[in-house]
Amino acid sequence: MTNIRKTHPLLKILNSSFVDLPAPSNLSAWWNFGSLLGVCLAXQILTGLFLAMHYTADTATAFNSVTHICRDVNYGWVLRYLHANGASMFFICLYLHVGRGLYYGSYLYSETWNIGILLLFAVMATAFMGYVLPWGQMSFWGATVITNLLSAIPYIGTELVQWIWGGFSVDKATLTRFFAFHFMLPFIVVALVMIHLLFLHETGSNNPTGIPSDPDLIPFHPYYTIKDILGFLVMLTILSTLVLFSPDLLEDPDNYTPANPLNTPPHIKPEWYFLFAYAILRSIPNKLGGVLALVLSILILVIVPTLHTSKQRSMMFRPLSQCLFWFLVATLLTLTWIGGQPVEYPYVIIGQVASILYFMILLVFMPLISIVENYLLKW
């Protein structure tokens, strides 16, 4: 008799996605991050749902409701810190996942790649709005500064900002709508994830060599389910260690002061996972130029497939491209560090050099070095 998982209308979809899915036999640990992102998303939606049961989206009570969750709700502090640090784990996995795609040439599956970029924007928007909800000093001023960037758009900028704020400043209306969007966006992310997987399963996974793996495929279960479970355990161990031993490690101390429109914090900065983009924004003295650079720092990923000039897909056998890739990683880490520093010498000039390098590596050096490699290999 045929197994029910292969005949049942719902189960056969799951079966073809997670059980009998043909997968390349040589996938490395870098292919774990897709499933880790799924776990992060599920954990964020669950903890967020329970937090929303106790949170009030009102300027007068938002800060106190978060304090109430931590002090009075059973294991509320665990929920709150799992959610806050879970976001950090989410972004670590996201950046490693994108980095894997860049290194191994997975971006040549352009539909999957472009849906992935949409997902990245959606998750970033969700995280930004979530950071506003505790209504601390950094929540309020972060929301004010980042939404104000839209005023750089010619003609409609000022009206657009006031429309988003729901008034003439960040206030109750802003907080309420941000809570609504923060609750809604993760479900849009789930829908996008399904489309992402749909397109991925049309082509099948790439593999570290970048060579078609059709002659050598193995079933996803049990080979990769067991590898994924190991990944889950490692990630959950790191997350629980962070939550239970130093939950505020990645937080900003300013956010433990209730929002005060009359008192500006000395250094307004976003969460650590946005610092690289914030550094690029700050490195350009012109407001509109900075906003464009900020958007392009992520949007540049869209044209990466077009700039692929190598005859090989993966960087596995391309040592020159590998050096350049790790140089790009170092540049991003430098930008992350600069984003958290005050706007003064020498940080400004380091940020400007790193920003120029970031765009130059992706737009100029990567395609050129690939052409050089082709020439050296007589291709």
Swiss-Prot record:
The UniProt keywords, alphabetically, are: Electron transport, Heme, Iron, Membrane, Metal-binding, Mitochondrion, Mitochondrion inner membrane, Respiratory chain, Transmembrane, Transmembrane helix, Transport, Ubiquinone
Q: Name one Pfam family in it.
A: Cytochrome_B
CDD domains, per this entry?
A: cytochrome_b_C (cd00290), Cytochrome_b_N (cd00284)
Which cellular component appears as one GO term in the record? respiratory chain complex III
For the ligand (a ubiquinone), the binding residues are 201
Q: Which Gene3D superfamilies match?
A: Cytochrome Bc1 Complex, Chain C (1.20.810.10)
PANTHER family named in the record: CYTOCHROME B
Q: Which family does it belong to?
A: Belongs to the cytochrome b family.
Q: How does it assemble?
A: The cytochrome bc1 complex contains 11 subunits: 3 respiratory subunits (MT-CYB, CYC1 and UQCRFS1), 2 core proteins (UQCRC1 and UQCRC2) and 6 low-molecular weight proteins (UQCRH/QCR6, UQCRB/QCR7, UQCRQ/QCR8, UQCR10/QCR9, UQCR11/QCR10 and a cleavage product of UQCRFS1). This cytochrome bc1 complex then forms a dimer.
Q: What else is known?
A: Heme 1 (or BL or b562) is low-potential and absorbs at about 562 nm, and heme 2 (or BH or b566) is high-potential and absorbs at about 566 nm.
Known role: Component of the ubiquinol-cytochrome c reductase complex (complex III or cytochrome b-c1 complex) that is part of the mitochondrial respiratory chain. The b-c1 complex mediates electron transfer from ubiquinol to cytochrome c. Contributes to the generation of a proton gradient across the mitochondrial membrane that is then used for ATP synthesis.
Q: What is this protein called?
A: Cytochrome b
